[in-house]
């Protein structure tokens, strides 16, 4: 076991020369986890150009302690290969120029 404690601002700049194909991988072996913890502050994932892709071999769980807001600049498509259940204790509002429930 080893712990490293550092103070101050630090930045890791990968592929500063902008060479195509210089990818950076973090791989963790079987039976271990990766945890990222911020005690007070934000976690920001940003791509200036490109996508953010998440692939899970099992369940994908999200727990939000406050509000959940999503803004989509293009279209939104959801495909479910099973059932969908939404449980809401408050009101539900759907707005659109046209809403087709059973097209």
Identify the role of each PLM range.
Residues 1-103:
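Right-handed beta-helix
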């Amino acid at each position: 076991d080893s712990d490293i404690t550092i103070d101050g601002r630090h930045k890791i700049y990968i592929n500063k020369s902008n060479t195509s194909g210089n990818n950076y991988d973090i791989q963790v072996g079987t039976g271990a986890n990766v945890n990222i913890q911020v005690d007070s502050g934000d976690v920001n994932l940003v791509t200036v150009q490109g996508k953010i892709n998440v692939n899970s071999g099992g369940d994908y769980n999200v727990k939000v302690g406050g509000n959940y807001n999503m803004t989509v600049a293009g279209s939104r498509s959801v495909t479910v290969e099973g059932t969908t259940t939404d449980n809401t204790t408050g009101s539900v509002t759907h707005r659109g120029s046209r809403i087709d429930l059973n097209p």
